[in-house]
Amino acid sequence: NNTFIIMPFETKMTSEQAIEKLKNLYGTEITTADIKAFCAMNDITYQTVTKKLQPFKVSKGKWNLEVTVEAVESIEKSFNSPAVIPASEKNLVPAVDATFLKFGNFPDVKKIIQSKQFYPTFITGLSGNGKTFGVEQACAQLGRELIRVNITIETDEDDLIGGFRLIDGNTVWHNGPVIEALERGAILLLDEIDLASNKILCLQPVLEGKGLFLKKIGRFVEPKNGFNIIATANTKGKGSEDGRFIGTNVLNEAFLERFPVTFEQAYPSVNNEIKLLRLHSASFGCHDDEFITKLVDWADIIRKTFYDGGIEELISTRRLVHIVRAYTIFKNKAKAIQVCINRFDDETKQSFMELYDKVDADFEMPETNESVEKL
């Protein structure tokens, strides 16, 4: 029979020596039961051993003696930011888009971002006119980091500020996008802010530029130089009177007052819109300047009629880009226009098609969906 001699545990034993003994007895993966047995054999307290093994703990009641201290630190560091890559290693500067054309309020928005001053900015305008894209490209041109948050009725403090997350049986604080932007000195873009509920009021102190106290963990976050907030919306925070933007809400007056400046974003002028569509057309591998010019003239007439109250729908710049792209795919004007305006009701769709027929003398008006399919 093999005889085992149990030696008294040396209280001055190093962590390396203790780990080596544990490996010899139980292997590299050990449990609470293994440690308790080891403590009983060596007349040592459970707390003393687990303290030595703290860097090797992988989950509750489990240790892996092959895990290095560096690996553990790397794992812990990865949970300090919303992504797996540590915040300091991420690049949040948007890419420059070759299809972008500056127009309207873009120079002013760019100046605000370039100043690195804390100057909350509210941008309002109809759908598809480049509000968000303009902010993104201003940051791209200036090399500024941008964190975009799409606001919904469900967005709350946990989504914006952060909260505790359950990781390997432990609760770990997880920064939200607002804290990330504060600490990085980035531009925080609150997209479609008029969809928010009253839970958005958790940003009141942030909109004053004074930082934010995280009451759940007792830490105050100072805003880094360059931090700013830009909000975009289809309304001015007073709801949608005509019902075009269902889901938008009336925002708190005190909240809106914290935005010192508001820009009203309009659709680009005819000349600018032609230039913009040419850029997109080139990126799609299509070159038909005549078609682009007719499309812009058509959209301009529709918008003027909309502003005068003659119709309830309009063609956005984004919709024109959709049509140009559809044209590069289907190689047919009628089909490209029709499939891109099918989202409107039949009466509106028919009136839009008839109007384009008047704008473009060479256009062949389709009679039915079936006839378009045959073209």
Residue ranges, per PLM feature:
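N-terminal amphipathic/basic-hydrophobic helices that include classical n-h-c signal peptides
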Residues: 1-12, 45
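Generic short N-terminal amphipathic or hydrophobic helices
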Residues: 4-5, 29, 74
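C-terminal regulatory/interaction module of P-loop NTP-utilizing enzymes
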Residues: 37-43, 48-54, 59-60, 65-375
